[in-house]
Design a protein with these regions (language model features):
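Phosphate/diphosphate-binding loops
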Residues: 39, 48-50, 57, 217-218, ...
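Inter-Walker segment of RecA-like/P-loop motor cores
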Residues: 207-248
């Protein structure tokens, strides 16, 4: 007998193989598959279909332990949609809600993939629309190829030089993914409010199809929206706000389900800090680059969603999350194609200040700015030499 059966009304949607805490989980869900093969309907229970002998579409296996990559076979909720032979089991953050399971069952992925593969992209190059260039079309096709032909991969990275039109490219991609119903809702994730506003303006202003913008055709939720509307097709949010909603939310009945978004777009996926860079208030919410990567990875791991990363400069931590870029269009190629202008070699100007820094000798009395009193005050005599190098200028020296 199955450990748990998931019914919505009288219809059987899933079975769960429950293991003891810490016990090995069969990541290929062998036991759940046996349950699904040997199900016998009775007492008015409805079987939704038969898929290669399996009489239930969604299978789960878990031991109650939160997923840890280091002990993959001993943690997490493992899930498999048996309706397509090419589907592989994967670890997810939790169980799908009844509403999510119904939507998953109603969604025809095979048909959506067929539309995505067969529908022409020519309209994206029209002057009355996005007017995309050839390399932008190739970028879209590269991501779509992963979605259609590599269902075992759930992430893709686009590397495109600054100034080559990443925003227009992603608008074209998002439109096709929504138009074909391949995904029902996209989360557009950024680390700064300004980036979100710039991208949102693009979705509102750029014409996509039939002289209409994305926002003219589909409903968009902006940064002020905490919980996406039921008819929302794309939702803009910062990493900071999303982490708070997912992991520091006290309102249990408003917790986002793992299927609230089935596609996530991460803008500026490389994300890094410079030692002498002044951080704004939003950036200060992250301790450092590692803290930022950790947090946006938490968001990616929470949702059962395909993720697309956008970057101009793929860093090691970026490829560790998204794998190697599925499409590259660098500065040199853009210059040769005539879309960007090459830069001259940098001229480095050195000064005594930048070379030697600022030094106060022992016995001197340095001055500091008193924020509370809004005045310059003199300190006591220094007991030892005090030196600031270039990296400390922006943060500690006026």
């Amino acid at each position: 007998y199955a450990d748990y059966a998931l019914f919505i009304g009288t219809s059987l949607y899933g079975v769960i193989e429950a293991k003891k805490y810490g016990q090995d989980i069969s990541t290929n869900l062998d036991q759940s598959k046996r349950y699904a093969l040997n199900i016998v309907p009775q007492d008015g229970a409805d079987i939704l279909g038969d898929w290669n002998g399996y009489k239930v579409p969604f299978l789960y296996s878990t031991n109650g332990r939160e997923y840890l990559q280091q002990i993959a076979t001993k943690s997490g909720v493992w899930y498999l949609d048996v309706r397509q032979k090419y589907n592989n089991s994967r670890s997810i953050k939790g169980f799908h809600s009844p509403e999510d399971l119904q939507k998953k069952f109603e969604q025809d992925i095979a048909l959506a993939n067929k539309k995505l593969e067969e529908n022409s992209l020519d309209f994206l190059q029209l002057k009355t629309g996005l007017s995309l260039r050839d390399y932008q079309i190739r970028a879209i096709q590269a991501v779509e190829n992963v979605i259609i032909h590599h269902p075992d991969l759930n992430r893709a990275l686009l590397a495109m030089a600054t100034g080559t039109g990443k925003t227009r490219t992603i608008i074209g991609l998002a439109y096709r993914l929504i138009q074909t119903n391949r995904f029902k809702r996209i989360l557009f994730l950024v680390d700064r409010t300004l980036l979100a506003k710039q991208a949102l303006d693009g979705f509102k202003d750029y014409k996509v199809d039939d002289l209409k913008s994305f926002s003219d055709i589909y409903h968009i939720d902006g940064l002020k929206t905490t919980w996406p509307d039921i008819d929302s097709r794309i939702h803009f949010a910062t990493v900071q706000s999303m982490v708070k909603r997912l992991y520091y939310n006290d309102v249990e009945d408003k917790a986002l389900s793992i299927d609230a978004y089935d596609c996530i777009i991460v803008d500026e996926a490389h994300r890094g800090y410079l030692l002498d860079k002044e951080m704004d208030d939003e950036e200060m919410e992250f301790k450092n680059q590692d803290d930022y990567v950790s947090k946006y990875r938490q968001v990616l791991d929470y949702f059962d969603a395909f993720a697309v990363g956008l970057t101009a400069t793929p860093a090691l931590h970026t490829t560790e999350i998204f794998n190697k870029p599925v499409f590259n269009y660098g500065l040199r190629e853009a210059v040769l194609d005539g879309y960007l202008v090459d830069q001259d070699p940098p001229i480095r100007i050195t000064t005594q200040l930048s070379e030697e820094g600022i030094v106060w000798e022992k016995g001197e009395k340095p001055t500091v700015y008193d924020k509370e009193g809004n005045q310059i005050v003199e300190l006591e005599e220094l007991e030892d030499e005090l030196k600031f190098d270039v990296s400390g200028f922006n943060k500690r020296v006026i």
